[in-house]
Amino acid sequence: MSSQLGHESSVSSPLSYKTDSNAFTREYAESLDAQDPLRDFRKEFIIPSKVDLKRKTLAIDDSSKDESDPRCIYLCGNSLGVQPRNARKYIDYYLRTWAIKGVTGHFLPHEDQLLPPFVDVDDAGAKLMAPIVGALESEVAVMGTLTANLHFLMASFYRPTQERYKIILEGKAFPSDHYAIESQIRHHNLRPEDAMVLIEPEDRLKPILRTEQILRVIDEHASSTALVLLSGIQFYTGQYFDIEKITAHAQSKGILVGWDCAHAAGNVDLRLHDWNVDFAAWCNYKYLNSGPGGMAALFVHERHGRVDMDKVGSDEEPFRPRLSGWWGGDKKTRFLMNNNFLPQTGAAGFQLSNPSVLDMNAVVASLELFNRTSMAEIRQKSLNATGYLEHLLLNYPADFSTGKRPFSIITPSNPAERGAQLSLLLEPGLLDSVLETLEEHGVVVDERKPDVIRVAPAPLYNTYTEYPTYRT
């Protein structure tokens, strides 16, 4: 395997849950929490209480502060992360700046500011985001929304010719990705049935895509493919693709490679720059906790973000073609309004409009927490916690009459091939009753009809003690 997965396969877990008969007890889980180096991060987040989940109003009352009201077991960070406690402070500071400075807040700094003036707030976001995805600061822009960013990137990187016009993607890609790719193909007056290559699982009951299968499809269509666009982590199964190996293989065939990292950013230890990825995009409201529909981000490798000043004014393109907007323009000339577009170097040159400072504050509130640790530490906790939860589930009592458990786990069993997610395929007809039972016990998970629930133990705020309770 490539270094991406091979490195993680060699990680030795300090946990002994597979051989310890006490692993199913609360006391054992509490001992794991006691030795967790990330345990103090939980207090940095607001976990909904069981009472909160059942409230019919949003009005704040004293009961919401009742310490006897237990927190819910929130295992849905792969769908929407919980609120960082400091989000309110960041947003309050933004509102205060807007209130007392108005338009001058774009340029005037404050001694007690959390973020720079409005005009530079996107730079602060990029600086904090870069280490989370393994990128240079210049390769990241915090901007827009995920599907819009995919369109912007494909406008630059999908440039079909008569010979190369196909896009390779998962057969069960997230619907918005599928729609975006299909519409880009139609935009170029091509037929999706000719230009979309869908990689389907070989086993319907175990819907994962083997790396060898993906590479084989790339080989079969190499001479006619313009772009490979896959998910870093597959939203349905939780499978972590071998980004480095797939990228290198496709590029060796002259194919550009992009990744939707919606379920990977803030989840696994990405190395987008080192893996030579051409481009990537992701949302920030899942593992990165920016709030519903929060501002997204994109990555453009430095080789694609260069601006050749020697070619400015010549017949040669000084920069990669793209959809352009004023916020992507050179800062030195941005406010001259001369209508001569010259982009900033790097991913910032792919920006279009000025960013929502309100949304940027919500993103940065969480990124600041991630920057207090490292993705390597977060990933190690994820490997431990997801493995522990898997162990508990695999030892769930079987039905006495059939000898079978009422579910199977369709997420890869190899820890290096998954993130902080386990997808459980339930026996037909069980979904509604299982969800009802979980809701009664204050457990929040994600459903994918007809029969799958996705469980995501988020390393920064979930505890080991929660998992025996969830299993029960």
Curated annotation (Swiss-Prot):
Principal location class: cytoplasm
EC number(s) stated in the UniProt entry for this protein: 3.7.1.3
Molecular function (Gene Ontology), one example: kynureninase activity
CC cofactor: pyridoxal 5'-phosphate
Enzyme class, spelled out: hydrolase
Biological pathway: Amino-acid degradation; L-kynurenine degradation; L-alanine and anthranilate from L-kynurenine: step 1/1; Cofactor biosynthesis; NAD(+) biosynthesis; quinolinate from L-kynurenine: step 2/3
Stated role: Catalyzes the cleavage of L-kynurenine (L-Kyn) and L-3-hydroxykynurenine (L-3OHKyn) into anthranilic acid (AA) and 3-hydroxyanthranilic acid (3-OHAA), respectively.
UniProt GO BP: 'de novo' NAD biosynthetic process from L-tryptophan; anthranilate metabolic process; L-kynurenine catabolic process; L-tryptophan catabolic process to kynurenine; quinolinate biosynthetic process
Keywords: Cytoplasm, Hydrolase, Pyridine nucleotide biosynthesis, Pyridoxal phosphate
Record's subunit section: Homodimer.
Entry's localization field: Cytoplasm
InterPro entries: Kynureninase (IPR010111), PyrdxlP-dep_Trfase (IPR015424), PyrdxlP-dep_Trfase_major (IPR015421), PyrdxlP-dep_Trfase_small (IPR015422)
Organism: Aspergillus niger (strain ATCC MYA-4892 / CBS 513.88 / FGSC A1513)
Upper classification of the organism: Eukaryota, Fungi, Dikarya, Ascomycota, Pezizomycotina
Family in the record: Belongs to the kynureninase family.
One cellular component term from this protein's GO annotations in UniProt: cytoplasm
Protein name: Kynureninase 1
Superkingdom assignment: Eukaryota
Catalysed reaction, written as an equation: L-kynurenine + H2O = anthranilate + L-alanine + H(+); 3-hydroxy-L-kynurenine + H2O = 3-hydroxyanthranilate + L-alanine + H(+)
Presence of the UniProt keyword Chaperone in the record: no
Record-listed pyridoxal 5'-phosphate binding positions: 146-147, 174-177, 231, 260, 263, 285, 326, 354
